[in-house]
């Protein structure tokens, strides 16, 4: 319990009620996933009681996990029904992958920093999310051997949408990615593949993410 006598499950429910619902997150499956996944298991031990605060939390190696609202917003934008295969770029601590795994059939998650990839595997195994596959690689190139994906979620800001990710998106699938300046504001875009050559784009507003590094990202 924290100093006010609240346990983390109470704080998790309050996060959903006070942070997500008032900001328009309405997909019941997303709200249930956010209430069910123990975010405190995906942050450093000394930050467990900050896990549900309305801001990003540092996880080491100069990286953070996004605030709960952003994770929920990106998950909701994918419109997952439960049978999808999803690509998650920027595993971090594994938290977003766990949320996505609660909403989809299978998740493939890529992390470029070996130490974070190893810790994410431990976090996901410990919390029972065995349907998440984690590898250490350049996320801007996707996971071609596992493609196509019904959803792709990118947790880092890109200068442009990587062509490899668009190519690995199934027809009817959705790609959610922040695009904009390095270290500044980005637009959170949702790109839907309409056919082999046609895509539709919508914006979910301004966000601020760490830069997406890699061959098709920032150098």
Swiss-Prot record:
Location in the cell: Cytoplasm
EC number: 2.1.1.77
InterPro entries for this protein: PCMT (IPR000682), SAM-dependent_MTases_sf (IPR029063)
Name of this protein: Protein-L-isoaspartate O-methyltransferase 2
Residues spanning the membrane: none
GO BP annotation list: methylation; protein modification process; protein repair
Organism: Marinobacter nauticus (strain ATCC 700491 / DSM 11845 / VT8) (Marinobacter aquaeolei)
Any one Gene Ontology molecular-function term assigned to this protein's record: protein-L-isoaspartate (D-aspartate) O-methyltransferase activity
Keyword field: Cytoplasm, Methyltransferase, S-adenosyl-L-methionine, Transferase
Gene3D superfamilies linked: Vaccinia Virus protein VP39 (3.40.50.150)
Family designation: Belongs to the methyltransferase superfamily. L-isoaspartyl/D-aspartyl protein methyltransferase family.
Catalyzed reactions per annotation: [protein]-L-isoaspartate + S-adenosyl-L-methionine = [protein]-L-isoaspartate alpha-methyl ester + S-adenosyl-L-homocysteine
HAMAP family reported for this sequence: PIMT (MF_00090)
Function text: Catalyzes the methyl esterification of L-isoaspartyl residues in peptides and proteins that result from spontaneous decomposition of normal L-aspartyl and L-asparaginyl residues. It plays a role in the repair and/or degradation of damaged proteins.
Xref: NCBIfam families: pimt, PRK00312.1
SUPFAM superfamilies: S-adenosyl-L-methionine-dependent methyltransferases
GO cellular component, one term: cytoplasm
Active-site residues annotated for this sequence: 66
Pfam families: PCMT
Top-level lineage group: Bacteria
């Amino acid at each position: 319990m924290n100093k006010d006598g609240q346990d983390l499950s109470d704080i998790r429910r309050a996060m959903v009620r006070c942070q997500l619902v008032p900001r328009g997150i309405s997909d019941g499956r997303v709200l249930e996933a956010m209430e069910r996944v123990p975010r405190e298991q995906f942050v450093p031990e000394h930050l467990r009681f900050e896990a549900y605060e309305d801001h990003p939390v540092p996880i080491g190696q100069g990286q953070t996990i996004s605030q709960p609202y952003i994770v929920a917003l990106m998950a909701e934008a994918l419109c997952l029904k439960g049978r999808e295969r999803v690509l998650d770029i920027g595993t971090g601590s594994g938290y977003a992958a766990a949320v996505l795994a609660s909403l989809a059939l299978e998740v493939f998650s890529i992390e470029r920093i070996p130490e974070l990839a190893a810790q994410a595997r431990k976090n996901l195994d410990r919390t029972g999310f065995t349907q998440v596959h984690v590898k250490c690689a350049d996320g801007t190139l996707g996971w071609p051997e596992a493609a196509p994906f019904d959803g792709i979620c990118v947790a880092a800001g890109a200068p442009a949408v990587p062509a490899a990710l668009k190519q690995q998106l199934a027809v009817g699938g959705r790609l959610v990615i922040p695009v904009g300046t390095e270290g500044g504001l980005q637009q959170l875009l949702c790109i839907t593949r309409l056919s082999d050559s046609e895509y539709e784009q919508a914006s979910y507003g301004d966000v601020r993410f760490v830069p997406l590094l890699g061959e098709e990202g920032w150098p």
